[in-house]
Amino acid sequence: VNWKKILGKIIKVVK
């Protein structure tokens, strides 16, 4: 699982 990709998507959604 690519946590960096998931975190990036979450950060994009949060921002």
Curated annotation (Swiss-Prot):
Q: In which tissues is it expressed?
A: Expressed by the venom gland.
Keyword presence, Zinc: no
Q: Which residues carry this modification: Lysine amide?
A: 15
| Record's comment on post-translational modification | The C-terminal amidation is required for full activity.
Query: Which GO biological process entries does UniProt record here?
Result: defense response to bacterium
Record GO cellular component, one term: extracellular region
Keyword presence, Transmembrane helix: no
**Subcellular compartments:** Secreted
Please provide the record's keywords in A-Z order: Amidation, Antibiotic, Antimicrobial, DNA-binding, Secreted
| Superkingdom assignment | Eukaryota
Q: Where are the transmembrane segments?
A: none
Specify where it is mainly localized. Answer: secreted
Q: Which positions make up the signal peptide?
A: none
What are the recorded GO MF terms, alphabetically? DNA binding
The entry's family comment says:
Belongs to the lasioglossin-like family.
Provide the function of this protein. Antimicrobial peptide which assumes an amphiphilic alpha-helix conformation upon contact with membranes. Insertion into membranes involves Trp-3. Penetrates into cells once membrane has been permeated. Active against Gram-negative bacteria E.coli (MIC=1.4 uM), P.aeruginosa (MIC=18.7 uM) and Gram-positive bacteria S.aureus (MIC=3.9 uM) and B.subtilis (MIC=0.7 uM). Has cytotoxic but no hemolytic activity. Binds DNA in vitro.
**Per its record, how is this protein called by name?**
Lasioglossin-3
